[in-house]
Amino acid sequence: MDLPEGPVGGPTAEMYLRERPEEARLGMPVSLEEQILNSTFEACDPQRTGTVAVAQVLAYLEAVTGQGPQDARLQTLANSLDPNGEGPKATVDLDTFLVVMRDWIAACQLHGGLELEEETAFQGALTSRQLPSGCPEAEEPANLESFGGEDPRPELQATADLLSSLEDLELSNRRLVGENAKLQRSMETAEEGSARLGEEILALRKQLHSTQQALQFAKAMDEELEDLKTLARSLEEQNRSLLAQARQAEKEQQHLVAEMETLQEENGKLLAERDGVKKRSQELAMEKDTLKRQLFECEHLICQRDTILSERTRDVESLAQTLEEYRVTTQELRLEISRLEEQLSQTYEGPDELPEGAQLRRVGWTELLPPSLGLEIEAIRQKQEVATADLSNPLCGVWQWEEVIHETSEETEFPSEAPAGGQRNFQGEPAHPEEGRKEPSMWLTRREEEEDAESQVTADLPVPLGAPRPGDIPENPPERPARRELQQALVPVMKKLVPVRRRAWGQLCLPPQRLRVTRHPLIPAPVLGLLLLLLLSVLLLGPSPPPTWPHLQLCYLQPPPV
């Protein structure tokens, strides 16, 4: 039997209108059967993917109709939806679902007994619309009671009443659709008439606007004509004034031509000057590059000087340690000398047994013993410190040659810490015979250094008794010409370090003690030999040469700025 069609305005119709918007716009009637099938497909596809599983559709129909999977009609539907036998993986889209379900419903109507199932399916579709979308309880018949509170299979009488009311609503819907179509046609006719009237009004407005524009144009032309007349009179006056200005401009042009010739001559002179300035700028650029290279070389030399200075500092520290060791050794030698003196005094029974001359010579020999070697070593160290302090930065000023020579000669004298009588050796002579002689400067020539070394060796030789000593002969120090030049700005003229001449070994050691020992018959020779051996050991263990710094050879370039 044919199922009645439901109203378009119901919830099922709304769902169908969402699925088929074209048919709803055209006002095509939708059957109740198609609405039920759409509701069934929507219930099985809550995610709106467009495809549902065949097993899900069968489970939904089993839950709605209350039939088991062994039902022959459901098995026939399963075979129709899954003709390839894919099993649980089989899916079907909406169009295929509608076609298969219509064929299946028609086949069931031919065999009869489908009215109850259709009514039950329709009631299940309505119930599924009331349930929330995507709820798994819609697929189980036991959970449907929790939403509606009743069994999903209502009574047959209530279902028949509902179907009859749906048929009435569908008939009224068809009548409303016909009336709506008539109203739409009349509305379209009215809209066409209104459009024609609007076009006519627009044409009239255009004509009115063109007429107004023509009138305004005529007025504007009249005003413009008056303006042109006035302008013509003013132009005539301007023409006369322009003629006078043209004659004046010709005179000015002749004057400007003369000025232009003068400017061209000046321009030629300026071009020549520009060429000269360019050449001068190139020369200055070359000088700048040369100065940059010299500056780089000076910086490199300063770095080397700092490195050498650090090495000299380490050497000074090591020399300080060596000096401390020498002090300890000197103290031990001093104790040994005192012990030997005691032994020497014990070799005789008493001072009364010695001859009077021997006693006097002994007293003189005791009084004229050499001073402490520690004082001499301290004096040498002070001299080295002063010489180190005199080393100046080669880039920070002028090396004062004359002052260095005088200062060096003054520093050669040892500080006298003895009594007013002075320090004397065994023979009553001054302990430092070289005090009256200037110490050779570090800037002496090689020949002068050799002569000084020979004089030192000659002074160190033993002098026979009664012979005049070299130190007793007055000797004038050689005079050296000192350059007295103004302190001026310096620039380096060499690209390498100039080593400073070092002193000879004889100049760096302690000043030798020129001893003239009187052979006393009571003093044994081994004791004198031991004393000489001690003095030689002190001379050999003297301090190392003082540290020197590298200096640049500089020349005067220009006076320094004041």
From Swiss-Prot:
Disulfide bonds: none annotated. It is a single-pass type IV membrane protein. One of its GO terms (molecular function) is dynein complex binding. One of its GO terms (biological process) is chromosome localization to nuclear envelope involved in homologous chromosome segregation. The chain crosses the membrane at residues 522-542. SUPFAM superfamilies: EF-hand (SSF47473). The keyword Hydrolase does not apply. Changing L197P: In POF22 and SPGF88; likely pathogenic; results in decreased meiotic attachment of telomeres to nuclear envelope in homozygous patient spermatocytes; reduced localization at the nuclear envelope. Keywords: Chromosome, Coiled coil, Disease variant, Meiosis, Membrane, Nucleus, Premature ovarian failure, Telomere, Transmembrane, Transmembrane helix. GO terms for cellular component: chromosome, telomeric region; lateral element; meiotic nuclear membrane microtubule tethering complex; meiotic spindle pole; nuclear outer membrane. The keyword Transmembrane helix applies. Its main location: nucleus. Residues 431-448 have a biased composition (Basic and acidic residues). It is found in: Nucleus outer membrane; Nucleus; Chromosome, Telomere; Nucleus envelope. Residues 164-349 form a coiled coil. Expressed in testis (at protein level). Residues 125-153, 407-481 are annotated as: Disordered. Core component the LINC complex which is composed of inner nuclear membrane SUN domain-containing proteins coupled to outer nuclear membrane KASH domain-containing nesprins. SUN and KASH domain-containing proteins seem to bind each other promiscuously; however, differentially expression of LINC complex constituents is giving rise to specific assemblies. At least SUN1/2-containing core LINC complexes are proposed to be hexameric composed of three protomers of each KASH and SUN domain-containing protein. The C-terminal 22 AA is required and sufficient for localization to telomeres at the nuclear envelope. As a component of the LINC (LInker of Nucleoskeleton and Cytoskeleton) complex, involved in the connection between the nuclear lamina and the cytoskeleton. The nucleocytoplasmic interactions established by the LINC complex play an important role in the transmission of mechanical forces across the nuclear envelope and in nuclear movement and positioning. Required for telomere attachment to nuclear envelope in the prophase of meiosis. Required for rapid telomere prophase movements implicating a SUN1/2:KASH5 LINC complex in which SUN1 and SUN2 seem to act at least partial redundantly. It is linked to Spermatogenic failure 88: An autosomal recessive male infertility disorder characterized by non-obstructive azoospermia due to primary spermatogenic arrest. Premature ovarian failure 22: A form of premature ovarian failure, an ovarian disorder defined as the cessation of ovarian function under the age of 40 years. It is characterized by oligomenorrhea or amenorrhea, in the presence of elevated levels of serum gonadotropins and low estradiol. POF22 is an autosomal recessive form characterized by infertility, and small to atrophic ovaries and no visible ovarian follicles. This is Protein KASH5. It comes from Homo sapiens.
